Amino acid sequence: MKQIILNGNLLSDAATVHDYLMEMLEFPKYYGKNLDALYDCLTDLEPVEITIQLPEEDGAIFQKVLRVFKAADRTNEDLKLNII
């Protein structure tokens, strides 16, 4: 199973969050860079373990992204989510 570690500090910036996720999770070029597209891509992932490191500051953007990851984790049996 592929393992990916995401830096929560980079999930807190609205301007860069989707570019970071697209690169780290190897999303397709047509990724829509919004929360709905994030959910769609996360639910289509093949077996992967994603660890999200909590950010220094827990802002609104991070909370929205985290909710999407948790929802996708409940839907996609091939996605294992860890939060540290």
Question: Regions from the language model: what does each represent?
Answer:
Residues 1-84:
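Positively charged, polar, low-complexity stretches
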